């Protein structure tokens, strides 16, 4: 019961942070529109590279999905990582992200996600020839297994009590997370132990973002 209450509080906490963040983002867009003439005078050519400095009241602790526990880290990670779904910045409803579509079984325990075919990891030396490859369903399975493993002792885990077989996987009783199945490169299914209305919102959190196995093995 404590874990469920904690998860609900954390979900509400991140939703509040999302409202504040997206509100600031919208305000920033309005300011940018006001200064459009100034930008035009300077030039319309996009500038790539360089360093962007952003002021914040607190320092972030980690932007690795499996270690995010604070609001500042979540805010930064949300601008770097992507998951299956995302929050609509206007009303915080769930919208597609890397998953272009999904369906839920009648008993609300089986989720099937269809991935977009045009999503790639950024170029990096961890990949073959330094070229970022396409994101596949196997990458999401790897990411969720990493999140549910015993490698990260965070104060909470929003999937351990929800995804079928997660507790057994964390305890080392199984070699893979049986609640997650890769149908093909673009299709993944997630089976829950019981219905959870908050699950789809959990998938929109930065913690649920996809990472590449090559990157984790190289950089940790």
Model-derived regions: residue spans:
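Aromatic- and charge-enriched surface segment that lines or borders ligand/interaction sites
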Residues: 100-156, 189
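A structural "hinge/loop" feature
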Residues: 58-74, 98, 125-129, 156, ...
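N-terminal lobe/hinge region of extracytoplasmic solute-binding protein
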Residues: 55-106
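Surface-exposed binding/hinge segments that line
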Residues: 138-141, 146-215
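Bacterial signal peptide processing site
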Residues: 25-28
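Bacterial N-terminal signal peptides that target proteins for export
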Residues: 2-11
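Immediate post-signal peptide segment of exported/extracytoplasmic ligand-binding proteins
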Residues: 42-53
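C-terminal motif of bacterial Sec signal peptides marking the signal peptidase cleavage site
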Residues: 20-23
């Amino acid at each position: 019961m404590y874990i469920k209450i904690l998860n609900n509080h954390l979900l509400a906490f991140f939703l509040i942070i999302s409202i504040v963040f997206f509100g600031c983002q919208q305000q920033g867009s309005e300011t940018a529109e006001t200064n459009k003439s100034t930008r035009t005078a300077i030039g319309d050519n996009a500038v790539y590279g360089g360093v962007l400095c952003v002021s914040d009241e607190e320092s972030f602790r980690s932007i690795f999905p499996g270690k995010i526990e604070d609001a500042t880290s979540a805010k930064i990670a949300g601008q770097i990582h992507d998951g299956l779904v995302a929050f609509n910045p206007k009303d915080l409803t769930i919208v597609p992200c890397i998953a272009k579509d999904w369906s839920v079984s009648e008993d609300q325990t089986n989720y099937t996600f269809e991935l977009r075919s045009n999503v790639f990891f950024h170029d990096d030396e961890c990949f073959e020839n330094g070229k970022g490859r396409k994101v596949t369903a196997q990458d999401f399975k790897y990411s969720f297994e990493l999140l549910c493993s015993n490698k990260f002792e965070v104060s909470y885990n929003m999937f351990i009590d929800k995804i079928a077989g997660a507790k057994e996987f964390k305890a080392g009783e199984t070699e893979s997370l049986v609640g997650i199945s890769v149908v093909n490169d673009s299709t993944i299914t997630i089976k829950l132990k019981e219905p959870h209305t908050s699950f789809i919102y959990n998938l929109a959190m930065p913690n649920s973002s996809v990472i590449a196995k090559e990157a984790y093995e190289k950089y940790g």
